[in-house]
Each structure stands twice: as C-alpha cells, then as structure tokens.
From Swiss-Prot:
Family: Belongs to the MS4A family.
Biased composition range(s): Polar residues: 201-213
Domains: entry comment: The C-terminal region is required for binding to CDKN3-CDK2 complexes and the modulation of CDKN3 activity.
Ranges per topology, Extracellular: 48-58, 119-148
KW Transmembrane helix (keyword) present: yes
Segments traversing the membrane: 27-47, 59-79, 98-118, 149-169
Job description of the protein: Hematopoietic modulator for the G1-S cell cycle transition. Modulates the level of phosphorylation of cyclin-dependent kinase 2 (CDK2) through its direct binding to cyclin-dependent kinase inhibitor 3 (CDKN3/KAP).
Taxon lineage: Eukaryota, Metazoa, Chordata, Craniata, Vertebrata
GO cellular component, one term: membrane
Protein's recorded name: Membrane-spanning 4-domains subfamily A member 3
Keywords noted in UniProt: Membrane, Receptor, Transmembrane, Transmembrane helix
Cell location: Membrane
Primary localisation category: membrane
Length: 213
C-alpha cells in the first residue's frame, strides 16, 4: 500500500502506528516500575520476618543475603523509567540507554529466577526439620510465609523477564541494535526510521524511532 503524502511528507500516515508503539513502550515501562516496587516491598517483608524469627532464619537467609530484592528492584525501576522516557521522547541517547539497561535487566531477572527457585527448593528441605524444632507450628507458619513471599517474588521476576525481553526485541526491531552503524553511515531514511535532514521531527517510522537531538 503506497503511503499518501501529507504536507509534503511520506511519514505522516504512519503517525498513528508510531503513537501506538510509544504507548506500548510506556505501558511496559510502567509494568517494570511496578514490578520493581513490589519486589522491593516483598523483600522488606522478608527482612521483617527474618528479624522476628530469630530461631528460624534458615527460611529466609538465601534471598536475604543475596540482596536480590534490593538490587533487582533498583535495576527494574531504572529500566522501566528509561523505557517510559524513551517512549515519550525517543532520542538516540534514550533509546540506546533503554536498550542497554533492558538487556542488563533481562540478565538480572534470569539470575533472580535462579536465586528464588533455589530458595524454594531449600525451604522444601527445611520444612522436614520443623517437626523436631522447639515450636513446630511456628516453624511451619514461618516457612509457609517465606514460601508465599518468595513465590510472589518469583512470579513478578518471571513477568519482568518477559517484559524486558519484549522491550529489547522492540528496540531491535526499531533498529536500535544497529544505531551506531546508522550514525556513521546514514541508511535509507524510510527503512531505518532516522529522519533525513530537514524533515519534520514529528514524522517518524512505525517502530519506536529516534528523533534528532
């Protein structure tokens, strides 16, 4: 289908799709921020339980001492904030920074998934010692609470993993992966989405594209 020219530009008919892409990026970024906040909150609950249950700290030690709820949440909130910013104003710098930190967050989410899975596996073994503990009921209750919090954290981490992969893929489809080559050797403006000199900055490609800084 041949795009119609509007105001002397062939980019105008693509505006609606471009705005949809920006909206999707901002929504995914908001999910990342919410995930980070919830993971941090669950981590705080784990810390509180760990301090209350002096005799049953083995239920909490793995996630607590790895610090995943803290540094994982920081990465997720940061990547979400950059994604929202890049969705609102897709400059080259914001796009590259968002792409880079989302790749890092994908790695962090994968590592967090491993940590939390190991924690749940360890708790399964720790439950077997509850019957021989001084307070079996308290032991089982704390173990169940720990499992519940860690399971929620694991679900949020898996959601974060899927979101970061989706955002990274969107940036790659928007030519961010080859953006450095595009800067040194300007490609066809319609294919890459990088605006030709003198064109209106509002008329961008269907993918989340960079505006001239």
């Amino acid at each position: 289908m041949k795009p119609e020219e509007t105001g002397g530009s062939v980019y105008q008919p693509l505006d609606e799709s471009r705005h949809v892409q920006r909206g999707v990026l901002q929504a995914l970024g908001a999910i990342q921020i919410l995930n980070g906040i919830l993971i941090l909150a669950l981590g705080i609950f784990l810390v509180c339980l760990q301090h209350v249950s002096h005799h049953f700290r083995h239920f909490f030690f793995f996630t607590f001492y790895t610090g995943y709820p803290l540094w994982g949440a920081v990465f997720f909130i940061s990547s979400g904030s950059l994604t929202v910013a890049a969705g609102r104003n897709p400059t080259r710098m914001l796009m590259q920074n968002s792409f880079g930190i989302n790749i890092a967050s994908t790695t962090i989410a994968f590592v967090g998934t491993v940590f939390l899975s190991v924690h749940l596996a360890f708790n399964t073994q720790a439950f077997k010692g509850c019957q021989s503990s001084p307070s079996p009921d308290v032991c089982i209750s704390l173990g169940s609470s720990s499992d519940g919090l860690v399971s929620l954290m694991l679900i949020l981490t898996l959601l974060e993993l899927s979101v970061t992969i989706s955002i990274s893929a969107m940036w790659c489809l928007g030519n961010v992966c080859g953006l450095r080559e595009a800067i040194t050797s300007p490609p066809n403006s319609v294919e890459s989405g990088i605006l030709p000199e003198g064109s209106d900055s509002e008329n961008l490609n269907t993918q989340p594209q960079a505006s001239e800084e």
